[in-house]
Swiss-Prot record:
The active site is at E154. It holds the Pfam family Pep_deformylase. Binds 1 Fe(2+) ion. Its EC number is 3.5.1.88. One of its GO terms (biological process) is co-translational protein modification. This is Peptide deformylase 2. The keyword Glycoprotein does not apply. Keywords: Hydrolase, Iron, Metal-binding, Protein biosynthesis. GO terms for molecular function: metal ion binding; peptide deformylase activity. It catalyses: N-terminal N-formyl-L-methionyl-[peptide] + H2O = N-terminal L-methionyl-[peptide] + formate. It is an enzyme of class 3 (hydrolase). Fe cation binds at C110, H153, H157. HAMAP family: Pep_deformylase.
């Protein structure tokens, strides 16, 4: 079981490296790692388990955050209408995106970053993601709103990018042009 002790913190070199693709079919060890990742994200949202194991609530996790330099992500997040997007993916890739942007009005946080870093993080409003599930199914999904932001945040981790890299250093709360504000 993954706990907060397994999550590397900001400054760890794994967070700034480009993760390697997972050769498919994945090994049993890789499947177990990804299964553990989605279990962690789900557990972190369960108040009883989060308190018992001292988990910070999260909506996503990327393998580099547990010092595994492979292209694997787990996302468990709802959109504004309450639809659940729960995915554990090998080799996720954004294959297309909108010109229009979006951002969370509350800013973003990260399980690997202990302090709050204020500012707007511009993201694409809509994305299309391809990847392979734990069951070996190749998927092609279209995302918008909060789930699209979560996927972009996690896929950034696979490329050594942190959310605060996107924040305007001169004016952190400068509203991105042509962007939808998303409340969370």
């Amino acid at each position: 079981m993954i706990t907060m002790e397994n999550i590397v913190r900001d400054g760890h070199p794994a967070l700034r490296e480009t993760a390697e693709p997972v050769e498919l079919p994945p090994t049993d060890a890789e499947k177990q790692q990804l299964a553990d990742m989605i279990e962690f994200v789900k557990n972190s949202q369960n108040p009883e388990l989060a308190e018992k194991y001292k988990l910070r609530p999260g909506v996503g996790l990327a393998a580099p955050q547990i010092n595994i330099k492979k292209r694997m992500i787990a996302v468990h997040a709802e959109d504004a209408s309450g639809k659940l997007y729960s995915y554990a993916l090998f080799n996720p890739k954004i294959v297309s995106h909108s010109v229009e942007k979006s951002y969370l009005t509350s800013g973003e946080g990260c399980l690997s970053v202990d302090e709050a870093i204020p500012g707007y993080v511009p993201r694409y409003a809509r994305i299309r993601v391809k990847g392979t599930t734990l069951e070996g199914e190749n998927i092609d999904i279209r995302l918008k709103g909060f789930p699209a932001i979560v996927f972009q945040h996690e896929i950034d981790h696979l490329n050594g990018v942190m959310f605060y890299d996107h924040i305007d250093k001169e004016n952190p709360f400068k509203e991105p042009e042509n962007a939808i504000a998303i409340e969370r």
